[in-house]
From Swiss-Prot:
One of its GO terms (molecular function) is uroporphyrinogen decarboxylase activity. Pathway: Porphyrin-containing compound metabolism; protoporphyrin-IX biosynthesis; coproporphyrinogen-III from 5-aminolevulinate: step 4/4. The record marks D93 as: Transition state stabilizer. Its EC number is 4.1.1.37. Belongs to the uroporphyrinogen decarboxylase family. The lineage of its organism: Bacteria, Bacillati, Actinomycetota, Actinomycetes, Streptosporangiales. Keywords: Cytoplasm, Decarboxylase, Lyase, Porphyrin biosynthesis. GO terms for cellular component: cytosol. This is Uroporphyrinogen decarboxylase. NCBIfam families: hemE.
Amino acid sequence: MILGHAARSLREHGTIRSVTLQDSAFLRACRRQPVPHTPVWFMRQAGRSLPEYRKLREGVPMLEACARPDMIVEITLQPVRRYNVDAAIFFSDIMVPLKAIGVDLDIKPGVGPVVAEPIRDLAATRRLRGLEPDDVPYVTEAIRELVRELGSRPLIGFAGGPFTLASYLIEGGPSRHHEHTKALMYGAPEVWTELMRRLSAITLEFLRVQIAAGASAVQLFDSWVGALSAEDYRANVLPYSSWIFAQLAEFDVPRIHFGVGTGELLGLLSEAGADVVGVDWRVPLDQAARRVRPHTALQGNLDPAVLFAPWSVVAERTDDVLARAKAAEGHVFNLGHGVLPTTDPAVLERLVEYVHTQTAN
């Protein structure tokens, strides 16, 4: 495939294979290698908690910001400058590839993704076309610039997992119970299979574009998959997540898998083929280490709400996360979910420094 060749060419020319980049604490931790300190980054580190982000986004809709390379680059770099995190994560949204292939959707402030015409039958599903690199030229342009700017600091690419994307398309927006999604999954298996196949291909291509442009790790956010039982996940989602991770194996970049409320699914998230499994705050990391398959690193898992407590509590809870993480084969420090919008940036800055200091060899 052309994109696969592009990604390999970039690696051969040093964008991915750079010695200093590969020796970064983040990539070493993902590969379960010794690290100079526990690496830190935060989900939603680029976002509403930063005043510089809010200023830049004034009057600019989310999907427009995600399609402007200049804004993507600046927003991605903001938390790197402020916090000294060990990795940047590409600024985008999981709905971007769906918007790029013509799905009528918007991201409404205070609501989230809203789809004009929910997809609930085979005809609508078959109208979802595949994603091509030319659909998202702004992604390639922005990532190439970011790789130049970041130097030896890794850039994480990402995409939405197939279940989460399916839920937004079927429900028409955010859902607490995912009732339409589950009804379709249970009652119309042929529609579900076709939808998941198409979404998996779209997700894979979106990740390939990012790797080809220079992303040195990728995370699959299947945020809402915790709504499923282990049995339903194994039957209806695992085959598609496994396929995505298997297709990514040739690029030799760390693959991270994350979902919220997935304590009972951690073994299955690991089974899907990720190198790193993200853990939310509900499961201690020493327990999580016993649930995932061997040769899997962990990411997480401080409760985002703890950051609103006095610093002594933040430090105590952080120490607990770090202590329990010793049971894992590799550890990337993160929150158990995204940074909350009203989080004080000064606390995050202090937290990064604290983790680096406490774990320095």
